[in-house]
């Protein structure tokens, strides 16, 4: 009734660039009805927006500024029907500035911090701008640093009752660990491992899911100087055989959950060099029981007189990372690595010393070192750990309010699962800051989360071989879809195949210049078991990430892809050889 125009048959062409910009809004008298035929259409009316699919329609007062774009990677066909009850001719359409557009990103504000004396100041000199953002960073005597002794044990002395970890089991059992608890229990574990013949430089593979025992074992190995090898509990026999041999493992700590121990047993039939097998969170014939045995040992630990203190450039841990040819390589990190995550935790995660931080990651991946251990404890913050069997947004979302989680980090895949829930049904007001990394950030994820929480997702970039290199950090206004800017810790550049810097807007490979020294946090190379040491991956003074990006006129970096054939899945790098 009172239709004054034939339906317009509109083909909205998909534009990648439009996904990162405000929708251009127009207005005119009357009403409008849009009906989608194929594809996906994002329609914004005032500050409200909807994603429409085939068969969906929307009806609105067209005097309200409105606009639409095709989304989801393809063109969209739709009918646009304009109606006017008065029957007057349709006035000329006029474009308006998007003053009623979606809430815009805002600079990250500093969390409430106690600016008194902190343990990290003994090792780190952080020069900050007036707004609290990082201007420059220097390290004091990193060659003598040992995280377990110099942070955990010292925190146990300075603030013994301060919460270090709130752990939730798969059956929802709650356990609270103070820094004094972690110090004492890791001392027992260090003495236990030492009694089993594990010494400085020995490699120990950990397959522990998110069991609380992982943190105890890691600190114990840090104290002994044994090298932890991070591994997923999803590995099968062939994966384990390769890892045991490639890393020269002497011992394995394995979860009793699932089929993990059985797969290890199958692998050990071909790997007699792995002489010690320890089961965690259960008992099994032929295995030592970590939980039953380590508590019997002393709660104080001092290296033997004939053993040097592990520190500085001694190896700390290894993590397998995918390559395009052959099996995964073994990235190595030294005892200076945790210092690099000070930037990750303080200026990107915005860890509050009086808050509770949650990063979603299994301990078999380097992401756990980013958000579940080193940087957070270095900043004197507590970590929240939930040892779930399978990720469920509906299971995790109520925990933010229940446990007052203040900062949060996850890959885009997890955020997408969360957004599929009705976020309005959950109280997320405890979250002060949210970060995202691991894959390219879809603008829809950014806007949906912002709509539900009022928080801008702050994207960051790094690798298993590094700490955070590029990010939307404290004081920055994020550009949706951008990784942010390089942090002062790393001398980051974008280069062409000849190693020359490229100009604004040109795509090239992200590299780190190390001609002036190796930054704390950058891998010392890939481990070669035949030589018993890491082999440097630096070429002509550059560490090559294998990732490509371009840089805009404001210095923000925009991710493009890999220079090789690696595939990203839920934030993990997977090589084609592994898939075969």
Residue ranges and their predicted role:
Residues 160-163, 278-279, 285, 295-320, ...:
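Conserved pre-ATP/AMP-binding loop-to-beta segment of ANL
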Residues 176-180, 309, 316-340:
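Conserved AMP-binding A3 loop
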Residues 225, 339-359, 363-406, 421:
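Conserved AMP-binding/adenylation subdomain of ANL enzymes
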